[in-house]
Amino acid sequence: RETLEHLIQKHHLEKQVRLLGYRNDVQDVLQSADCFAFPSKREGLGIAAIEALACEVPVIASDNRGSREYMCHTENGIVCQADKVADFMDAICRMRQSGQLRREMGERGRRTAERFSIEATDKIMRRVYQEISVTQERKR
């Protein structure tokens, strides 16, 4: 945290960047954001990024196995290489400069996140279990 605070001060970003720590009001915080930066080098599914998409917040994510499941470059956010900090900075600046871009990507992001909702996941799992059940009955 100290390193981040130092960088924020060094680049005079105190008005633009806040380190919030643990919060109970994540949805409210996300909905007030211009974008959600998710620079993980390795990630499973990336629930935090999907939560941001569900709140219509465009995501700037690193290209990894997990983000490929939900990120579509320039559709619901921007995909960058994890080790290219300048690309992340450019993407963040691009998001801050265009409200229209944020709104368009945010709307498409919400639709993306719907694929990962509890209801959608439940439907898929029920179908899988049904297929397994039918397959097992045929083997008997």
Protein language model regions, located:
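C-terminal alpha-helical cap of glycosyltransferases
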Residues: 118-140
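A short, well-ordered alpha-helix in the C-terminal region of glycosyltransferases
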Residues: 87, 94, 101-115, 124-127
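Short hydrophobic beta-strand element within catalytic cores of glycosyltransferases
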Residues: 58-61, 71
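Conserved acidic donor-binding segment of nucleotide-sugar-dependent glycosyltransferases
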Residues: 73-74, 78-85, 94-99
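Nucleotide-activated donor-binding/catalytic signature segment of Leloir-type glycosyltransferases, i.e.
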Residues: 3-21
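Aromatic "clamp/platform" in nucleotide-sugar-dependent glycosyltransferases that forms part
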Residues: 22, 41
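Short glycine/serine-rich donor-binding loops of glycosyltransferases
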Residues: 46-49, 67
